[in-house]
Amino acid sequence: MDKKKLSHSSLQSSVTSVLAALLCILIGLIVGFLVLLAINPAHAWGDGFVRILKGGFHDAPYGVGKELANAAPLVMTGLSVAFAFKTGLFNIGAAGQYTLGAYGALYCAIMLKMPWFVCLLAATLLGGIWGAIPGFFKAYFNINEVITSIMFNWIGLYLVNELVYQNGTGPMYDVRNTRTLNLSKNPAFAQSIIPDFGLNKMFQTNSTTIAIFLAAAVAILIWVVLNKTTFGYELKAVGLNKSAARYAGINEKKNIILSMARAGALAGFGAGLYYLSNVAQWNPLNSTSLPTMGFNGISVALLASSNPIGTIFSALFISHISVGGSFLSTKYYPTEISDLISGIIIYLCAFSMLFRGKIHGLLFKNADKTNVNAEPAPAKTETKKEGK
């Protein structure tokens, strides 16, 4: 198959993936509207569905800034899950890696008062280490990464809570607010906050920084690594067929560990973007639930079909309807309606292979037949003149 046919096939795959995702979103929104009708038909349209569709634009520019602030870590946790998916692994441990990344970023900011980019590096490093451990067990003991990742989610949560809280005497802990110290309220931490370059004034919020642009840049970088480098080829080869990769001389064990380490690093980086933008402070007393950003990353990756560039748009969409749900009037609807719609969309994404097959059949059926029935080009033959 020549390069032209490969490019054509890749374009068809991209088109069908995008259309399948849009179909999932459309069906999810329709089902969500029907739920709103069932709960309170009188306000289902204006006070319900329209507010969800408007998202942050319902209270612009503040709401839009809130969307961007929440989307940045979603892009990163989505990349974390998608990167592992591409290499044949299921990184359900993004929540734990995100937790360790949050601790690394906040420790460097509060205790060491380091610049924001150093704090981000610390978050990335700790997340990567936490991700590499399940990768090690998978590579050398063939222990399912899903099981070890889930266990390390909870280990990471309780470890970080104890390191921060320390029976209420931890130096990072604010007893009055029962959270870590607020970075924006202490000038000593100013250098640890990600710069906003005027975005805070534009969106009238103190948590909108360049984090979303950093996340988008990382997504593009991951796409390049996976599709344009030998390292990315080796990772995907191990994911597609370990035996064939081993036969080709690729170090299977090394690539499994590196894949999970990089997935963890991406999740940790996302936590750094979130907490160093001062969107929230860590609450060590919340010991019963893991950070939702880690699990929402699974939703982002599924909606994007594990495409690194697609995670940017799917994260923005998930953030959009989540913020829209927060603007619902609690007199008529619970704010969890947006989570319900997200859940329906993600559930439908599980059937995306079926949707892609149907869409491909409808759009490219005739084109495929033309390619199959086309006669191959005649081979060039050289004739030798016989000398007398």
Where are these regions (language model features)?
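Cytosolic-side transmembrane-helix boundaries in multi-pass membrane proteins
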Residues: 1-25, 38, 240, 247, ...
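Membrane-interfacial amphipathic/re-entrant helices at transmembrane-helix boundaries
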Residues: 2-76
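Single transmembrane alpha-helix segments in multi-pass membrane proteins
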Residues: 36-37, 55-111, 124-143, 244, ...
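Cytoplasmic juxtamembrane regions at transmembrane-helix boundaries
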Residues: 83-104, 226, 231-234, 329-334, ...
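Transmembrane helix-bundle core of multi-pass membrane transporters
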Residues: 153-226
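Transmembrane alpha-helices
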Residues: 214-218, 248-274
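Membrane-helix/interface signature in polytopic inner-membrane proteins
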Residues: 221-259
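Transmembrane alpha-helical segments in multi-pass inner-membrane proteins
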Residues: 266-268, 273-343
